UniProtKB/Swiss-Prot annotation:
Keywords: DNA-directed RNA polymerase, Magnesium, Metal-binding, Nucleotidyltransferase, Transcription, Transferase, Zinc. The RNAP catalytic core consists of 2 alpha, 1 beta, 1 beta' and 1 omega subunit. When a sigma factor is associated with the core the holoenzyme is formed, which can initiate transcription. Mg(2+) binds at residues 474, 476, 478. It comes from the Bacteria. Coiled coil: none annotated. This is DNA-directed RNA polymerase subunit beta'. GO terms for biological process: DNA-templated transcription. Pfam families: RNA_pol_Rpb1_1, RNA_pol_Rpb1_2, RNA_pol_Rpb1_3, RNA_pol_Rpb1_4, RNA_pol_Rpb1_5. HAMAP family: RNApol_bact_RpoC (MF_01322). It comes from Salinibacter ruber (strain DSM 13855 / M31). SUPFAM superfamilies: beta and beta-prime subunits of DNA dependent RNA-polymerase (SSF64484), Rudiment single hybrid motif (SSF51246). GO terms for molecular function: DNA binding; DNA-directed RNA polymerase activity; magnesium ion binding; zinc ion binding. Residues 1408-1448 are annotated as: Disordered. One of its GO terms (cellular component) is DNA-directed RNA polymerase complex.
């Protein structure tokens, strides 16, 4: 047999291909056949010969020792023992040598008929159920009807055993003697053999042609999609089969491989028992059944017994390959399913994620961390005990060098004695050797940083306080891991790239991350705060030295207000305090004098300025200085937290009284029937929310005044050291409203209802038992949420990393001319993110000029710095076009100019930066933070008070657009009621240029309080409305008539128990034909119909006279929700996964006028007709939804017709890719912004780019794509480019080409001229048609699985599915992303591991000059990109350089 030739595994490869293994392949890799199911001998504990652990097949158990012991020691290496047949070699070969089992009958591989899509089923055109009947020996299948065709037998028909024998009985007797290729012969088989024969007989090319024809001509969508699915599998095999690497019949196996025994070990436990890997059990079952089947075949057992045994063999092999796919999986002794080969790959504990993507490493240790305030920013304290252990090999080398010991063994003993010499050597060894510190969970790249170790006597690692925010570390028992970089390159990278003092900026938003907090901030705040009537107040000083002198001599107090000549040399006097002067001594000289109280908010910009104007080195010194000052001053200030510092304001009682009265009033209105229960509830909640806010204002005012603003609790909160306004409110104000306990925590997000009686006490007064009980619920919800949501955030991060891991910066400029327009982000006219913030650090697409002076502000392809951004913001420019990764046209990854500035360094991003992973980490890291935010405030509910007015933000003149109003008179007099949906009020500048200052959309049903053309002042109220109810108004005067409003069918009468007031509330009716409506009949006989949605409360009775503008029905808006990131994280996930929302809005696809059609099955038809009447689209909107449009309204494409969220796929199909990108970006940013988290847009853009990378083929043209294929946009473009200037043969004439073949212009000319010479007609051709695709939006999970790298996809999710699909395609992974390379054990192709740097030769300049002189070159250096120039060194020279380099 052709097996046993050992293959050494190459480590230096640049791609990995996965394909089906042929039986020959399996035999070639095998070292022998496993014949017996035995494992080891129970007496000698040695492997049984020919068994699953056989030494003859897999190699010796002990190094260089054969089974019988005839040959021992290394000198017999390579000899095969003549007694036991074992090769004398290393025992490590037992980890790499494979065996095999030859099966008596072919067995079908479970992956290819149990995973979806069913590969074998698609190829043969069989249903999965039918296929399984054949495979598991229930039915015969007809492979060739032959003479049985006259009996009505067809190909692929299933036959029971009786039918099979019946047919054999009826056809010719010599059927069995005929050859298989004789068309007369009737062939029907069963089991794996049948499937194998059918796969062998397949003609893939012919099948592909038939299927392509069917796809082109098929009218039924269902049949067409079925044909496409089949075609997909057929094409996969055809592509892979061009070089004979994949044959369909290899999905049926005649030999199965046995993996090396060390990978499925038998481990002796104490007590004489053995623990074994599940695989051994599974293999044993296969071998036992296979041997039994062999024996049965040999003794010619009856067919029934054989068939049963064959089926059992098939099942045994199935279990071995994938036990979890089987319904009746094989279970072990403890009744758990055994882990099969597939399970070894899958999931977190599988091969990919456990051993390939993450490994445990040598030279590492972990210990508890403590604060090290005496350290410098780039240092960490390392316990001596740990250091000795970590640097042991280095110490041993030094000991031997110094001649203290002779051998490594004695050196080890010497080190363990821990003598003086050892400590001396250790001090020397760690000089210039950084260590890496890591804290789990490592949520972003700052979770691992490099430090210079300082040896300490304790057993805990000491951490600099300023790196805590980056690690999110505290000292309540956190542990950290230490790693030692070994090679010179690793040390260099650690020092240059990873040193903590070089990582002060956050990669997420570019702001400083090493910001003092807690004690340090308290000290800085204390030292820079002013106090009246202090010693030396009002003194004037000429310079800083004088102030220092006076303070040191106790002439002036720390908080005294003094005057100082401005150090900038302008000679002006500035009002400041002594403390601020002392703080400014720590600032670098280049910075302006900082004259403000330093709270967390104010310190951050100061650090940012220092960073910008100096650099990392000086910033680190500055940070160390303010750290020391902060700690010292907070200690000497004597700030403490005491009960007497909590003040309860006197006004609290009054405010609560007032609130109680208002609530009482609402209750009365309700009992009189003026308002609904819902309105009452909303009013009560609002009252308490407002009261709570007032109490906390009063409380803070009192604290501010107390001790002249030096109240410790106020100081701690105001400086941002500890505690929040919210927490102090609960200490001294009132705890406020609580969330209502609800069953469905975490479902659908929202925080749910709020209890309407608040907790009036605070923690200083103490809570009553009832109040305490109510408040426990919120606190527990917080803790439960934390636990559940952390996992979600972690999973989100994992998916983000997976989708964007392969995005690196691959070139400087991709040369695109496109960009995206960005302006300031506004929310109801309030600027959320100004223009300058959104364009800083990006690159402009074209030159930008000042519109007034026409001077150039920024050139095309130039980086917009802070200064340029401010210049642009000063002008009247509203938006500017910038380069973006969304429009970047780089083949792989993105280019420098489209990405812009690297936020972590403040410089342009370098080629090789792995921006994808940074983006994923920047988005995922706060996700975890956000989830942990809920419980600090103990679950107290906060809610926004609903908006109910429009106030003018500017003074100006009013203009109306699309605003329809009607005058309506009620008991309070006449009022203007708005009847339009999209009506706008604009405030125009009163000056000459009449530009629009701002515009407001006025909601339907609002009362308009101003007239067109009126002048308004800032703060005037323009309109007001009911914030608790949506209204339905009548637009004409007339009489009310009800239609389909039937008691207990379409409405129920709700009687309020307390008030006796009755209301008609519309309910969803069982009968779909009924559509409740209120009809208003006008005097001239016109009828206006108003549909009543579910939950509408009708305000009029049948026969009432109504006037235009009167309310017909109210719909309560949703009860107030608490806003909490619990809703936020699922929202982020929903957007990134591009999910359709639960209740999506129906969206208009065209601009046009709305009209209503019929009502069918509980839905209203809405028709949109374009203005020119050419196009008409009709939509069905469920009647339970609230309509946002009315008859005659004008809508634009993308406008909603009813309420609900717009599905991103709708935006893509209606408004195009740019709009959906903007939608996703803004929606996700909004969630983070609500939580006060700053993340730069470019990070979201990187992820959105990956979501939109693929297109769906709508017209395959003359390419090999199939309709509905999802392919990479770049791939489609390059294949279409290849088709340019090519032709498709329609009639080949006599040339050697096929119909439908694609040929180039040149070949066509040559063939035609040949035909001309022979006087034959020319070839008839047509131009080749390119493929057409439409952009696709994929969720991040789908996008990750759709990558070109199968290794990355397989290690992400759905491992078996990815591997089966790749195997039949014989896919090659080019190892371009980061993940694939980690799996393959290569350095990643980013940063210093880029492929371009692989072949560079490193040497000194002098060596290069010597070389050139030797070669006789002209002294020119080789060109920079590693390509050989004129004077390029030869290979021998290169080797010399490398040798000398390594000596240095």
């Amino acid at each position: 047999m052709p097996y046993g030739n050992s293959k050494e595994i190459e480590t230096d490869f640049d791609s990995i291909t996965i394909s089906l293994a042929s039986p020959e392949d399996i035999l070639e890799r095998s070292y022998g056949e496993v014949m017996k199911p035995e494992t080891i001998n129970y007496r000698s504990f040695k492997p049984e010969m020919g068994g699953l652990f056989c030494e003859k097949i897999f190699g010796p158990v002990k190094d260089y020792e054969c089974h019988c012991g005839k040959y021992k020691r290394i000198r017999y290496k390579g000899i095969i023992c003549d007694r036991c047949g074992v090769e004398v070699t290393r025992k490590a070969v037992r980890r790499e040598r494979m065996g095999h089992i030859s099966l008596s009958v072919p067995v079908v591989h479970i992956w290819y008929f149990k995973t979806l899509p069913n590969k074998i089923g698609h190829l043969l055109g069989l249903k999965s159920k039918d296929l399984e009947k054949v495979i598991y020996y229930e039915n015969y299948i007809v492979i060739q009807p032959g003479t049985a065709e006259r009996l009505g037998v067809e190909e692929n028909q299933l036959l029971t055993e009786e039918e099979y024998y019946e047919i054999l009985y009826q056809i010719r007797d010599d059927n069995n003697r005929l050859q298989d290729d004789n068309e007369e012969k009737f062939i029907a088989k069963i089991g794996g053999e049948a499937v194998e024969t059918m796969l062998e007989r397949l003609e893939l090319d012919k099948l592909a042609q038939e299927l392509r024809y069917q796809v082109r001509t098929e009218t039924s969508q269902q049949r067409k999609s079925k044909a496409l699915k089949r075609l997909d599998v057929v094409e996969a095999f055809r592509e892979a089969n061009e070089d004979g690497t994949n044959k369909p019949e290899w999905m049926v196996m005649r030999v199965i491989p046995v993996i090396p025994p060390e990978l499925r070990p038998l481990v002796p436990l104490d007590g004489g028992r053995f623990a074994t890997s599940d695989l051994n059990d599974l293999y044993r079952r296969v071998i036992i059944r296979n041997n039994r089947l062999k024996r049965l075949i040999d003794i010619k057992a009856p067919e029934v017994i054989l068939r049963n045994e064959k089926r059992m063999l098939q099942e045994a092999v199935d279990s071995l390959f994938d036990n979890s796919r089987k319904s009746n999986s094989v279970r072990g002794s403890s009744n758990r399913p055994l882990k099969s080969l597939s399970d070894m790959l899958k999931g977190k504990q599988g091969r990919f994620r456990q051993n390939l993507l993450g490994k445990r490493v040598d030279y590492s240790g972990r210990s508890v961390i403590v604060s090290g305030p005496h350290l410098e920013l780039h240092q960490c304290g390392l316990p001596k005990e740990m250091a000795v252990e970590l640097f042991k090999p280095f110490i041993i080398r030094r000991l031997i060098e110094r001649g203290i010991v002779k051998t490594v063994k004695s050196a080890k003993k010497y080190v363990d004695k821990k003598t003086e010499d050892v400590w001396d050597i250790l001090e020397k060894v760690i000089q210039g050797r950084p260590v890496l510190l890591n804290r789990a969970p490592t949520l972003h790249r700052l979770g691992i940083q490099a430090f210079q170790p300082v040896l300490t006597e304790n057993k805990a690692i000491e951490i600099h306080p300023l790196v805590c925010p980056a690690y999110n570390a505290d000292f309540d028992g956190d542990q950290m891991a230490v790693h030692v970089p070994l090679s010179h390159e690793a040390c260099l990278e650690s020092m240059v790239l990873m040193l903590s003092s070089h990582n002060v900026r956050s990669p997420a938003d570019g702001g400083p991350l090493a910001v003092p907090s807690q004690d340090m901030i308290l000290g800085l705040y204390y030292i820079t705060k002013a106090k009246s009537n202090q010693k030396g107040e009002g003194m004037r000083f000429a310079n800083v030295q004088e102030v220092r002198q006076a303070f040191d001599q106790d002439q002036v107090a720390l908080h005294a207000k003094i005057q100082l000549r401005d150090p900038d040399g302008s000679g002006e006097m500035i009002d400041t305090t002594v403390g601020r002067v002392i703080f400014n001594e720590t600032l670098p000289d280049t910075l302006d004098y900082v004259n403000e109280v330093l709270s967390t908010k104010n310190v951050r910009p100061v650090i940012a300025r220092v960073l910008k104007q100096t650099g990392f080195e000086e910033t680190a010194d500055f940070l160390d200085a303010i750290k020391d000052m902060g700690f010292r001053r907070s200690t000497t200030s004597g700030m403490t937290f005491s009960l007497s510092d909590i003040i309860i304001p006197d006004e609290k009682e009054e405010l609560i009284e007032e609130a109680n009265e208002t609530v009482e009033e609402a209750e009365q209105n309700y009992s009189m029937g003026f308002i609904t229960d819902n309105e009452r509830y909303n009013q009560v909640i609002d009252v308490w929310t407002k009261t709570n806010n007032k109490v906390s204002e009063v409380l803070f005012d009192a604290l501010k005044e107390h001790k002249e603003g030096f109240n410790p609790i106020f100081t701690m909160a105001d400086s941002g050291a500890r505690g929040s306004q919210e927490q102090i409110r609960q200490l001294g104000g009132m705890r406020g409203l609580m969330a209502k306990p609800q069953k469905n925590i975490g479902e659908g997000g929202g925080g749910g209802e709020i209890l309407e009686n608040p907790i009036l006490s605070n923690f200083k007064e103490g809570l009553t038992v009832q109040e305490y009980f109510i408040s426990t619920h919120g606190s527990r919800k917080g803790l439960a949420d934390t636990a559940l949501k952390t996992a979600d955030a972690g999973y989100l991060t994992r998916r983000l990393v997976d989708v964007s891991q392969s995005v690196t910066v691959t070139e400087h400029d991709c040369g695109t001319l496109r960009g995206i327009n960005v302006g300031a982000l506004k929310d109801n006219e309030e600027v959320v993110a100004p223009l300058s913030d959104r364009i800083t650090g990006r690159v402009s697409v074209r030159d930008v000029y000042d519109p007034h002076t026409d001077e150039l502000i920024v050139e095309a392809n130039e980086l917009i710095t802070d200064e340029i951004a401010d210049d642009i913001a000063q002008t009247s420019i509203e938006e500017i076009e910038i380069r973006s990764v969304l429009t970047c046209e780089a083949e792989r990854g993105v280019c420098t100019l489209c990405y812009g500035q690297n936020l972590a360094t403040g410089r342009m991003v370098e080629v090789g930066e792995s921006v994808g992973v940074v983006a994923a980490q920047s988005i995922g890291e706060p996700g975890t933070q956000l989830t942990l935010r809920t419980f600090h405030t103990g679950g107290t509910a906060t809610r926004e008070v609903g908006e109910s007015t429009i106030q003018a933000k500017f003074a100006g003149t009013l203009e109306f657009e699309n605003l329809r109003t009607v005058t309506y008179e009620d008991t309070d007099g006449p009022k203007e009621v708005v009847l339009s949906r999209q009506g706008e009020v604009r405030i125009m500048d009163t000056d000459g240029d009449r530009r629009e200052l701002t515009s407001y959309v006025v909601p339907y049903g609002a009362e308009l309080l101003v007239d067109e053309g009126e002048d308004v002042e800032d703060g005037d109220v323009l309109a007001s409305w009911d914030p608790y109810n949506s209204l339905i108004l009548t637009e004409a005067n007339g009489t009310v008539r009800f239609e389909d409003i039937i008691e207990d069918t379409t409405y129920r009468e709700e009687t309020d128990e307390q008030t006796g007031h009755k209301e008609k509330v519309i309910v969803e009716s069982r009968e779909r034909t009924l559509t409740p409506a209120v009809i208003v009949e006008t005097e001239d006989g016109e009828q206006r119909e108003y549909n009543m949605p579910v939950d509408a409360r009708i305000q009029v009775d049948e026969g009432d006279e109504v006037q235009a503008g009167q309310t017909l029905a109210k719909m309560p808006r949703q009860a107030a929700q608490t806003s909490d990131i619990t809703g936020g994280l699922p929202r982020v996930e929903e957007l990134f996964e591009a999910r359709t929302p639960d209740e999506p809005a129906v969206v208009s696809e065209i601009d046009g006028i709305v009209s209503f059609g019929d009502q069918k099955r509980g839905s209203q038809e809405v028709i949109v007709t374009s203005r020119d009447g050419d196009m008409e689209k009709s939509y069905m909107v469920s009647l339970s939804k609230h309509m946002l449009v009315h008859e005659g309204d004008y809508v634009e494409a993308g406008d909603r017709l009813c309420d609900g969220q717009i599905a991103p796929h709708d935006i893509l199909s209606i408004k195009g890719p740019r709009a959906v990108q903007e939608h996703l970006l803004n929606e996700v940013q909004e969630v983070y912004r609500l939580q006060g988290v700053d993340i730069d847009d470019k990070h979201f853009e990187v992820v959105i780019r990956q979501m939109m990378k693929r297109v769906k083929i709508t017209e395959p043209g003359d390419t090999n794509f199939l309709e509905e294929d999802q392919v990479d946009r770049q791939k489609m473009a390059s294949i279409n480019d290849d088709l340019y200037d090519k032709f498709v043969v329609k009639d080949p004439s006599d040339a050697n080409v096929e119909i439908g073949e694609v040929i180039g212009r040149r070949r066509l000319r040559e063939l035609n001229s040949e035909l001309k010479r022979e006087d034959k007609p020319e070839i008839e051709v047509r131009e080749a048609r390119p493929a057409v695709g439409e952009p696709l939006l994929l969720g991040i999970t789908k996008a990750s699985l759709a990558t070109d790298s199968m290794i990355s996809a397989a290690s992400f999710q759905e491992t078996t599915k990815v591997l089966t699909n790749s195997a039949i395609r014989s896919r090659t992974d080019p190892l371009e992303g980061l993940k694939e390379n980690v799996v393959a054990g290569h350095s990643i192709p980013a940063g210093t591991g880029q492929r371009e740097y692989r072949d560079l030769v490193v040497g000194s300049k002098s060596e290069l000059e010597e070389l050139q002189a030797a070669i006789g070159g002209d002294g020119e250096s080789p060109s920079g990109d590693g390509a050989a120039g004129d004077g390029a060194p030869s290979e021998e020279d290169v080797e010399q350089i490398e040798a000398s380099g390594s000596e240095n």
